[in-house]
Amino acid sequence: VTTTPAGYGTAMTTMPATESMGFGPLRISFDGRVLRPRPWTEAQSTWAAEILTTAPPGPVLELCAGAGQIGLLAVLGSSRPLVCVDMDPAACDWARHNAADAGLADRVEVREGPMDEVLRDSERFAVVVADPPWVRRDEVTRYPEDPVLAIDGGDDGMEVAWMCVDVARHHLLRRGTLLLQLGTVAQVDALRDRLADDDLVVTEVRRCERGVLVRLDLT
């Protein structure tokens, strides 16, 4: 039985139409309040799943989770728990919904709020997956179909990405991995420069259809 997030079907509430799409073997539901899943971001899930085969034991953390599709697909073939974090209540509702639809509700926890506040200081993760907004603030009007919160990366497009890096640095297990999505090679270069003497090291970069995936390992 498929359910929808709270608030649907009430006489006093008008909600955007529900949509669904395939994401790998998963069926992901969402509406216009959250960023539409991009099929090409399956590459991030696939790479994360590969990393999990040799990562240290431990759960997976997804930051800026949206409807949850990247993290859900990443852990689908494993038995690892997943924690999804997002600021947007609607995104969190859909992430819970999609976890249940995927049969993963028993090992997926969704937390709503700032990423640096909803994690316990002692929590550690084997892999962190992050798809932060990376569009420069002065360019968000080029994408009127997308919720601003989901794409606004600040003045340089890196504001939320830096937050993801800081959270990952604190919460990764030793030898753990952050798999980060960015928008441009220039953003990757900025990341390399800032982390030149850091314990979190850029070890591989892959270009995708629209964006760049960066693997960072905690040494």
Language-model regions: role of each:
Residues M158-R215:
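Conserved Class I SAM-dependent methyltransferase catalytic core
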Residues V1-M12, T219:
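Actinobacteria-biased recognition of intrinsically disordered, low-complexity terminal regions
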Residues P132-V160:
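Mobile active-site "lid"/loop adjacent to the S-adenosyl-L-methionine
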Residues S29, E109-R111, T203-R206:
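General small-molecule cofactor/ligand-binding pocket signal
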Residues W40-Y143:
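Conserved SAM/SAH cofactor-binding pocket of Class I
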Residues C84, G153, L180:
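Conserved SAM-binding loop
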Residues T13-T54:
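Class I SAM-dependent transferase core
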